[in-house]
Amino acid sequence: MSIKEKLSALGLTLPTAAAPVAAYVPAVKSGNLVFTAGQLPVIDGKLVKEGKVGSDVSAEDAKELAQICALNALAAISLVADLDQVERVVRVGGFVNCAPGFIAIPGVVNGASELLIKVFGDVNGKHARTAVGVAELPLNAPVEIEVIVQLKN
């Protein structure tokens, strides 16, 4: 089953890659690795929600936003590589725009991790990860996700 078919089976569609908001590209291929820029929870060019997780945005909503970010990361990867050529997800970096005292950061980033595991499988989808709480994110986004994947030789 292709990656697009797996996404469809999950009720998801690969979006068009979001345009960069500054001086960078959505993804870079270097050897057999693809690095994405940080992806925001954007649908059709618009930020789905903004604000701090734990005050303006619930942890549950933020987890769903992290899934949108991961889907956008797949779209970014598809600009430079065939998604069906992804061997495995290597690493996910998750950044959560936190209200003071909000510490459930790993649960938010799980939204991205769980989607990638569903799409690429339990072995190839599991990855190393960083989940960091931050004071601010671009455009006041609640979540930002970056992904590194390894391509098949």
Label each PLM-derived region with a short phrase.
Residues M1-N153:
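Short, polar/acidic, helix-capping and beta-turn segments at strand->helix junctions
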